[in-house]
Amino acid sequence: MPMPDELASLDGQVAPAAQTMIPVTEEGFLRGDGVFEVIRVYDGVPFALDDHLTRLERSTTNLRLGWSARRDELEQDVARLLDARGGSDFDGCLRIVLTRGGRRLLITEPLPATPEHA
């Protein structure tokens, strides 16, 4: 079964990224207020995930977003999304976005094509 180029997880629910919707009334969307990390994924394993999540926690604390107690949810979201994306068959990027409105958005993206050298 072919996979869409991008899958997303919004608050733990996995779906094609194009079908994932955030309400326009969401405070993080309205104010442009949140934090994000982009993580390289090799064979279904996010590189330095612990370091990235630590940085996200630090950023949410600095902005007073109140996310420090939800690390376990993020770890579960990451595992569920990467499993849906093909597990060890997936090489690409994982973007994690946390908003002031309390949303957890994770998106998988394929690696951009590299140009051919003549």
Regions found by a protein language model. Give the residues of each.
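Conserved alpha/beta cores of soluble small-molecule-handling proteins
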Residues: 1-118
